[in-house]
């Protein structure tokens, strides 16, 4: 479920997302009629085009800023000033309501919160991190999400120093880039 504020803001509370994911896994285990200890692995699939900020301990610092949220529209001009054709050439995607403008919005409009953010991650990464007890330093993004980031060179599967520098975003706020099949970690007892 989403929370709405006016006609431009659409977000989701991370703790609620996590609780819903835990309940879904519990229901799947019950429906399968297996013991929780028999679960060999879990794969997360979640929304791709929005982002959220996490702290050093992996805790949510911001709500999940949905791709439906339009408050970041004023950041489009910054990106377009860089050159939309150039952004498409580097990232493989046009300027949209995805990660890039949202990150710039947090930096411009909520600098006190932006400073507390260790990494920006999509919700699937956040949920996996919670399930595995990972820290901000261990934060990751699956390379198939990079075209939404607004800051990645999708051909190289790496963060674009050129875009990050031009838009004043620290590379340290970007998570490590992984393959979709990489193992993130083990499940916590929680």
What are these regions (language model features)?
Residues 15-16, 40-82, 111-112, 137, ...:
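Glycine/Thr-rich phosphate-binding loops that ligate phosphate moieties of nucleotide
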Residues 31, 81-86:
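Conserved FAD-binding subdomain of flavin-dependent enzymes
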Residues 4-5, 75-78, 151-153, 187:
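Short, charged, surface-exposed secondary-structure boundary motifs
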Residues 1-62, 89, 116, 165, ...:
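N-terminal glycine/serine-rich phosphate-binding loop of ATP-dependent small-molecule kinases
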Residues 86-190:
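Gly/Ser/Thr-rich active-site cleft segment
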Residues 9, 79-83, 188-190:
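Short, surface-exposed amphipathic charged segments that create phosphate/polyanion-binding patches used
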Residues 3, 48, 70-71, 181-183:
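Acidic, glycine-rich active-site loops and adjacent beta-strand->loop/helix elements
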């Amino acid at each position: 479920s989403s929370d709405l504020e006016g006609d431009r803001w659409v977000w989701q509370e991370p703790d609620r997302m996590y609780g819903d994911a835990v309940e879904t896994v519990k229901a799947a285990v019950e429906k399968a009629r297996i013991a929780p200890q028999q679960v060999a692995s879990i794969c997360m699939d979640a929304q791709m085009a929005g982002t959220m900020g996490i702290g050093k301990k992996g805790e949510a610092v911001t709500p999940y800023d949905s791709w439906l949220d339009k408050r970041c529209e004023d950041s489009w001009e910054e990106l377009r000033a860089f050159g939309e054709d150039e952004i498409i050439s580097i990232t493989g995607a046009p300027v949209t309501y995805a990660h890039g403008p949202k990150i710039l919005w947090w930096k411009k409009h909520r600098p006190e919160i932006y400073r507390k953010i260790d990494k920006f991650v999509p919700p699937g990464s956040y949920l996996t991190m919670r399930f595995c007890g990972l820290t901000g330093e261990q934060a990751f993004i699956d390379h198939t999400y990079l075209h939404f980031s607004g800051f990645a060179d999708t051909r190289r599967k790496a963060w674009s120093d050129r875009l990050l520098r031009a838009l004043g975003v620290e590379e340290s706020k970007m998570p490590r880039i992984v393959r979709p099949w990489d193992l993130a970690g083990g499940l916590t007892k929680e």
